[in-house]
């Protein structure tokens, strides 16, 4: 028996791993978005700390939420929606992130409205929705890094 068929089958199987390629492409696509996410989080934390300290009056907080924070959250969600992983598990994890970032953007809109209308109950409800979106985002990072880790990659939440 000729060793040629075995050699051909071995060479055919030596191609790159499609999951590894997808994870690497995903890592590269997500890194700039995660950098923007870090800037967004820092901006929101700045506003939140001012609210907590009472440093800023209601119109200024609402204006910053409306003019800076909320549009950045909307844009980030829209950019994330454009990324379409090929691997089903990676796609499912990414869908969780897109949903979390969408919920966060919606909570920022609701906080802006509640703050402008001086409605503490509505603000608290929006704040709780924001906290849940953060938990969902954490679940995403755990899930996606379980997928990426075998390939020596980390989807870094704080690049």
Regions found by a protein language model. Give the residues of each.
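Bacterial N-terminal signal peptides that target proteins for export
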Residues: 1-4
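C-terminal motif of bacterial Sec signal peptides marking the signal peptidase cleavage site
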Residues: 10-13
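Bacterial signal peptide processing site
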Residues: 15-17
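Alpha-helical segments in soluble extracytoplasmic regions
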Residues: 22-101, 107-108, 114-115, 122-159
């Amino acid at each position: 028996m000729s060793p040629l068929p075995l050699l051909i089958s071995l060479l055919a199987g030596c191609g790159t791993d499609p999951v590894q390629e997808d994870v690497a492409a995903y890592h590269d696509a997500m890194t700039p978005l995660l950098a923007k996410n870090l800037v967004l989080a820092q901006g929101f934390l700045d506003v939140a700390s001012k609210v907590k300290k009472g440093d800023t009056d209601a119109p200024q907080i609402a204006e910053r939420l409306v003019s800076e924070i909320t549009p950045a959250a909307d844009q980030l969600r829209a950019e994330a929606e454009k990324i379409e992983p090929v691997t089903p598990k990676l796609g499912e994890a990414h869908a969780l992130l897109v949903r979390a970032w969408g919920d966060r953007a919606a909570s920022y809109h609701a906080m802006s409205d509640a703050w402008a209308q001086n409605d503490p109950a509505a603000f608290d409800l929006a704040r709780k929705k924001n906290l849940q979106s953060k938990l969902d985002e954490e679940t995403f990072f755990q899930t996606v890094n379980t997928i990426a880790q075998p390939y020596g990659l980390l989807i870094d939440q704080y690049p």
